[in-house]
Amino acid sequence: MNLGDAISHASTLFMPEFLFGADEAMLIGERSANEEAIHLLVEEFFANPNPGFGFDLVIDLADRNRSLCDMMGPESVQADRSRNLANHLSDDDILRGVAALQHRKVEKVAQEVQGMNATKGVLYGSKPAKGTFVGIDIETTSTSPDRGYIVNVGWEVMQLAEDAQPSDAKSVFCGIPDQYAETGVPLSEIHKITWDDVKDKTPFREDAELHKELLKALKAHPFMAHNAAFEDSWLMLHLPGYAEARKEGKIIPIDTRDICRALDPEVRFMSWEAKPASLEAWAQRRGILAADEEERHLGLDDTDLMFRTLIAELKERNLLK
């Protein structure tokens, strides 16, 4: 598939009833085409100042793909992962995030990287952190942003200071299609969100007021998330206006998992199986959670845990200004 094919595919009128009774191979083929088109369109949108299409075309295709996945069932959806979930933020994103965290110019941070082949540890530890940030966490029905739904989102604003208290906290449960009343909320074994939590709630994609409020918060301050590439990938395909603001540099993501790996020396001596950079393990090492205490896996709770753990880490490394 080339870019022209992707635009044509995304622009085609979709009639779900044409796929009723289709075998699994046909459904998987259609899903694969959708996801390849999304990938090509996202790449072109960010690479080209004038891509020739609006990002609403991409979001509409992602909506279409979710409807298709609802027809396939959760087992097929979770069997593999869409290519539209990023594994990490880009190098440019990391430079912008470090600059925002340390209140420095991006160009200055970039010069340091070129001059000393700086590792992430050197970057994050080179200057104290300061300022005000918005933290966010989402809970979803899939790992793939073009296959599942956001069922919970929480965010709050925090200043990076030892005795700081959060402000402007918000937590919202979001609805999903009625078919999940019988089958249950996918990934509930992780986030413990049940049908009763989302029953009669407005779906995220349909909540215009939530879109407006969340986009405003994300543009007001750089945002932090633990594995920020996850939130970034999901918001890209769910929140209208997010991709445009990201492209314009009005939204800056910062990954606290990167900060954990860069600053906490214990991570390097722990096994991969122990998930040393997980929020739960990090919070336990910094004494924010007890050794037998677990992460909640709810948006606002995890956001607050992330901020408290980050501040404890920065204090431990003498990086709080």
Where are these regions (language model features)?
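Short alpha-helix plus adjacent loop in nuclease-associated cores
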Residues: 254-273
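Acidic, divalent-metal-coordinating active-site segment for phosphoryl/phosphodiester hydrolysis
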Residues: 298-309
